[in-house]
């Protein structure tokens, strides 16, 4: 779902009920993905019914692609609707901005979703961009780019 290429992040998502969020080091939450579920159809129609009467080989939706500049301290959250159906964007942002580790943040997101009812599967992937000492190859690559 995420691909890091030469210091840039490219968010990709296929159709479905999962979301990708970005939270900046300043605490600003943004949804990078589009919802592709009933009622949130990409083309004004639900994703399944928009293909009624179309030959199978002609079907297909392009993934959402959102180029992102990589910034140290940014967190990226990929989560299923087991999280987003239970927690508001504000609740998600509150948890993501806490001064706790990535693993503690994931545990808290899952715990809160379960406390609020957890009716669906709960899947969470969270990454945080951190500064890392560059290898000689990395330094040379930056020199030429």
Residue ranges of model-derived segments:
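Conserved subregion of the PPM/PP2C metallophosphatase catalytic domain
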Residues: 1-79, 83-145
